[in-house]
Amino acid sequence: PFGHSGERAISTFFSEGKGLRLKEIQPDGEQLSTMEWEDLTHFEGNANGFAVLTATRPGNEGGLRMSYATLGAFMKYPKESLPKKPTAAIADKKYGFFQTDKAFFQDVASDMGMIPNKSGNDIGFERHPLAYLVEAADDNCYTISDFEDGINLGLVSEDFALEYLIKLVKDSIDTSKYKTLETKEDRISYLRALAIGSLINDAVKVFVENEGAILNGKFPYSLMDMSKYKVQM
């Protein structure tokens, strides 16, 4: 819920601000572990999302009580905060749970049959297959919607938008319909819907073509990394 700016603000509070004192002072006299301190000084929204979804509160046992399959699909980065980016694989780009949620995270991953990919005491797994689709949906919609906002705010010209989006919509655009749309907002909304549709179809194609590798934990890319529209994204 904090966005990337919020992540940086929280991280800076603990690494440079008043939160720095918590590294040494704990109510029970114990110091935070290296991993716990990393969770605070490199705060990660994906890990916080997992905590929000699963946190037990008075009268609310198990948080939102989502199915393990839903939580598995949510877990884009199924590893702890350290080591940082141990490989170039997309699943190792960030981390997906705080130390306080480690036991439950491992329980979900184990129950879903997610493939362990770390050695020693490090905790990490290959992605749940559906996490690739969740990531693609997130990337596709936000990228195009942010672009649409830029156009509607006058930061991007309509002509440039059409030039940018044409490779995404050229196979599906109805030019006669497009010409009947009277306002810029309607025209851009039409292009946005077509563009997202093209990206969805391509993501599905990449997923199906690589399903075997994905199921076996051998697909270290995002779906959009392999998309024919990667340049546009």
Give the label of every model feature segment.
Residues 171-233:
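C-terminal subdomains that position terminal phosphate/3'-OH groups for nucleotidyl transfer/ligation
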Residues 2-191, 200:
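Sequence-structural signature of the catalytic-core scaffold of metal-dependent phosphohydrolases
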